[in-house]
């Protein structure tokens, strides 16, 4: 099973449509089964097309581009988390080729006010792959030392939805650097959660942030992770869209993995 996670930084990028087209091309070429995206936005004032999806929804435009490339197997889920940059409904999304058996979304932040930019939501779906049920989560969590919305609270809320009798794959921007000891990364790993990167036979340096971006100063960091509650057989886990493996299309790099089921 091939999987990908990316914080899209959507509608904050120059040449955004070109970057959506490039993302669609790579998804098509690499034949991913599941993609988890974060910072998937649509304009507050744009026209509603169906359900909660508006005409400039990043995921909707990505889907249309995939269809243009002849890829018609994907289904997507999108959930509005909070207002971003005063003009966007920012959310999280999952894209998959496989039948979605169940879906849900839930808050992990203390706040449930969608006008507050620190409000955090998770989207989850259940699929079947090679006759095996798998639960997939797209995650965007807060910072370790945030006094209003601390990471511990959010991680605990997330893990309440991770069931021992399910194979769970948690993908996304965890906003906690895996290179730092005794902070958010160690906290969640100590809850019997496995890092796919650590399990992988083949891997690179794992860096998904270089230099300064929103709220982060100048260090190389591994914020974007693929985690599981099970010891899975992982062929590789590598960074993509970093200028070395694929063009840069966001202020985060993506992470892809191949897992054997």
Q: What positions do the PLM features span?
A:
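Short, conserved active-site loops that position catalytic residues or coordinate cofactors/metal ions
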Residues: 30-33, 37-46
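Active-site regions of metal-assisted phosphoester/phosphodiester hydrolases
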Residues: 1-34, 68, 73-261
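A basic- and aromatic-enriched beta-loop-alpha substructure that forms the phosphate/nucleotide-
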Residues: 42, 52-55, 59, 83-94
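Short, flexible/disordered intra-domain loops and linkers
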Residues: 13-14, 42-57, 183
């Amino acid at each position: 099973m091939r999987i990908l996670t990316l914080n899209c930084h959507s509608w904050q990028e120059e040449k955004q449509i070109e970057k959506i087209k490039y993302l669609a091309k790579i998804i098509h070429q690499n034949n991913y089964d599941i993609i988890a995206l974060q910072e998937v936005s649509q304009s507050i004032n744009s026209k509603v097309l169906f359900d909660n999806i508006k005409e400039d929804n990043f995921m909707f435009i990505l889907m249309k581009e995939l269809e243009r490339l002849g890829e018609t197997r994907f289904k997507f889920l999108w959930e509005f988390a909070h207002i971003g940059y005063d003009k966007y409904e920012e959310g999280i999304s999952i894209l998959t080729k496989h039948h979605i058996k169940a879906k849900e979304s839930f808050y992990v932040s203390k706040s449930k006010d969608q006008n507050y930019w620190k409000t955090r939501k998770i989207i989850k779906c259940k699929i079947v792959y090679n006759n095996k049920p798998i639960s997939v989560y797209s995650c965007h969590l807060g910072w370790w030392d945030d006094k209003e919305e601390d990471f511990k609270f959010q991680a605990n809320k997330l893990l309440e939805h991770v069931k021992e009798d399910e194979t769970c794959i948690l993908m996304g921007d965890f906003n906690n650097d895996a290179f730092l000891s005794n902070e958010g990364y160690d906290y969640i790993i100590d809850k019997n959660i496995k890092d796919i990167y650590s399990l992988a036979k083949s891997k690179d340096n794992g860096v998904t942030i270089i230099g300064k971006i929103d709220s982060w100063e100048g260090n190389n960091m591994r914020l974007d992770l693929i985690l599981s509650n099970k010891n899975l057989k992982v062929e590789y886990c590598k960074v993509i869209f970093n200028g070395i493996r694929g063009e840069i299309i966001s202020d985060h790099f993506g992470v892809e993995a191949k897992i054997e089921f």
